[in-house]
A protein has these predicted regions:
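Transmembrane helix-loop-helix hairpins at lipid-water interfaces of multipass membrane proteins
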Residues: 10, 16-73, 77, 150-155, ...
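Hydrophobic alpha-helical transmembrane segments of ABC transporter permease domains
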Residues: 10, 21, 25, 29-33, ...
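A short amphipathic helical element positioned immediately N-terminal to and/or at the very start
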Residues: 1-11, 113
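ABC-type nucleotide-binding domain
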Residues: 332-581
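Short intracellular "coupling" helices and adjacent cytoplasmic loop segments at the cytosolic face
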Residues: 47, 83, 91-115, 119-121, ...
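Alpha-helical transmembrane segments of multi-pass membrane proteins
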Residues: 14-16, 63-82, 133-140, 161-188, ...
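Helix-loop-helix
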Residues: 49, 53-55, 148-162, 232-312, ...
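An intracellular "coupling" helix at the cytosolic face of ABC transporter transmembrane type-1 domains
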Residues: 11-13, 77-78, 99-103, 119-128, ...
Length: 581
């Protein structure tokens, strides 16, 4: 894990190394100051020697300035290294997510991925910044201050060897308890993100069903769970500060009592024992040693908080995409023919029954195919195997006579345009959204594609035309308008295969007919697969596939199915009756 995260330093590697070096310089100056202070008092003030006073005062000033300089440099380099590390980590995670298949996304959930890319990375950034500063400062301060105090008085320094193990025991008791709580907190953040995303995306539904109070109470329940867990963690961590203060004041009390006796016994003579200046230095070292332990405990707490985010981010970084391009992949799609050869598919190995079973189909290039079936009959699942959004569990899917697993994924998907059942538009202008299909498309090509999709008629009605701004998710256009824009975007790819997954359900029958007519006249060489609920949308298709419970119930054109399939006739008659009513 450490090796993988270390790769995220990249260009900030040396910056991350310079910060601890500067921190060591700062600590060295801080440890030197009490020694200079002792000499200032013992050999300057006590002996009324102004030359020594001025000399030691200058040394103190230089040490203080050097400490300030090293401290500022360390903080600056640490900040740059931590920020750069977080940027690279977020970059690597985001790029990994882009390679995920649908099944990888389903494994984590979108809300969890958002949490990991935002709050988890922020927590890791803070922990890393503290590590390269405090994790160096505290041990160095502890070691140098202890060595300096041992040089002054080994007898007085023995008090540290009692206090330090006691504080270590307190810390070791706190960390496991706190870790479990923080691990639970970050999982709860995923739930919080899910609630917020669902509420914001579905705010119109929430308001139409007057469910604001219910949503607020749901949000408050999760927020309270996070609050309660943080309170528990803080209550446990609160033990740390009193324990530290007890140790500090106990050490100072012991050093004051024993040290004062030693100063009196030596007559304030360094050659015979302890001096007043050295005793004051011992007080400073006591504070430095025990405060370094206090800061070290904070580092442990921060690292403990970061362990859960580290594990969660590591899961993203090491998750292997289920679908990858093979070596020596095919980089050209010959034509738009499609073959399903004894195809079965399960969304997971734990699924009780397959979503698709024993599917055998041949679709000639350039044909128009209608796909019909009840809700849950696996119509969408069938077409998602063509651009290899999922891999068939059994059998093979061929495009242009070649198994889809042999294609380069980018090449395959570039030749298969798919308008999903759930249409998605991104914030930006209509032009920017359309150019997702073809970044180099000219304005004339945009207009032509929109005319084929019957979108030009409403776009030109907007004051800003094709420069009209689309809100996130396309919230400022109607469902039918959104569908037509998505169809136009797909057409701009100039694909060999075009898949419309119930993508005209929100448009009227006249517009639907106009779109189908444009397809027939303008893109005859493109294989068109149209999933629809209305037989009227697909009855002119060359082939109609009727799906039932993951099986192909029947295949043929409209006239053939009307004669041979009772199931198809039943659907047709019910829809005809509904239209007459």
């Amino acid at each position: 894990m450490i090796k993988r995260f270390a790769q995220c330093l990249r260009e900030y590697k040396w910056t991350a190394l310079v910060s601890p070096v500067c921190m060591i310089g700062e600590v060295a100056m801080e440890v030197t100051i009490p020694l200079v202070m002792a000499d200032l008092y013992d050999y300057g003030i006590a002996m009324s020697n102004m030359a020594v006073v001025w000399q030691k005062a200058l040394q103190l000033l230089l040490c203080a300035l050097a400490s300030l300089l090293f401290g500022c440099l360390s903080a600056d380099y640490a900040s740059k290294a931590a920020t750069g590390f977080a940027r690279n980590l977020r970059h690597d995670m985001y790029y990994r997510v882009q390679d995920f298949s649908f099944s990888n996304i389903d494994k984590f959930s979108s809300a969890s991925i958002v949490t990991r890319l935002t709050s988890d990375v922020a927590t890791i950034q803070m922990a890393f910044q503290m590590m390269i500063r405090m994790a160096i400062r505290c041990p160095m301060m502890l070691i140098l201050a202890t060595v300096s105090s041992l040089r002054i008085s080994p007898k007085l320094s023995t008090v540290y060897f009692i206090a330090i193990p006691l504080l270590a025991l307190v810390l070791l008791g706190i960390i496991p308890l706190v870790f479990r709580i923080f691990d639970r907190v970050f999982k709860t953040y995923d739930r919080l993100n899910t609630v917020v995303q669902e509420n914001v995306h579905g705010i119109r539904v929430v308001k139409s069903f007057v469910r604001e109070d219910k949503e607020v109470s749901k949000f408050e329940a999760i927020s309270k769970a996070i609050y309660d867990d943080f309170c528990k963690a803080e209550h446990i961590l609160a033990v740390n500060a009193p324990a530290m203060q007890i140790c500090v004041y106990s050490c100072i009390l012991v050093i004051s009592w024993v040290g004062a006796k030693m100063v009196v016994a030596s007559g304030n003579n360094a050659a015979l024992g302890l001096t007043t200046g050295e005793l004051s230095s011992m007080f400073t070292y006591t504070t430095q040693i025990l405060s370094s332990l206090m800061m070290l405990s904070m580092v442990f707490v921060m690292v403990t908080m970061a362990q859960a985010p580290l594990r969660r981010c590591y899961e993203i970084l090491t998750e292997k995409p289920d679908l990858t391009s093979p070596e020596n992949a095919v980089r050209d799609v010959p034509d738009g023919s499609i073959d399903f050869e004894n195809v079965s598919f399960r969304y997971s190995q734990k699924a009780k029954r397959p979503a698709l079973q024993d599917v055998d189909l041949h679709i000639p290039s350039g044909s128009t195919v209608g796909i019909l079936g009840a809700t849950g009959s696996s119509k969408s699942t069938l077409v998602q195997l063509i651009p290899r959004l999922y891999d068939a569990t059994e059998g093979s899917v061929r495009v242009g006579g070649i198994d889809v697993k042999d294609y380069d994924l980018e090449v395959l998907r570039d030749n298969v345009a798919m308008v999903l059942q759930k249409n998605t538009l991104f914030s930006g202008s209509i032009k920017e959204n359309l150019r997702w299909g073809n970044a180099g498309a000219t304005d004339e090509e945009l207009v032509h594609a929109c005319k084929l999709a019957c979108a030009d008629e409403f776009i030109t009605g907007f004051p800003d035309g094709y420069d009209t701004h689309i809100e996130q998710g396309g919230s400022n256009v109607s469902g039918g308008q959104k569908q037509r824009l998505c169809i136009a975007r797909a057409l701009l790819k100039k694909p060999k295969i075009l898949i419309l997954d119930d993508s005209t359900s929100a448009v009227d029958t006249h517009t639907d007919a106009m779109i189908r007519k444009a397809f027939k006249e303008e893109i005859p060489g493109t294989t068109k697969l149209i999933i629809a609920q209305r037989i009227s949308s697909i009855q002119d298709s060359d082939i109609i596939i009727v799906m039932e419970n993951g099986h192909v119930a029947c295949v043929g054109d409209h006239e053939t199915l009307m004669k041979s399939s009772e199931f198809y006739r039943g659907i047709y008659k019910s829809q005809q009756k509904g239209s007459e009513d």
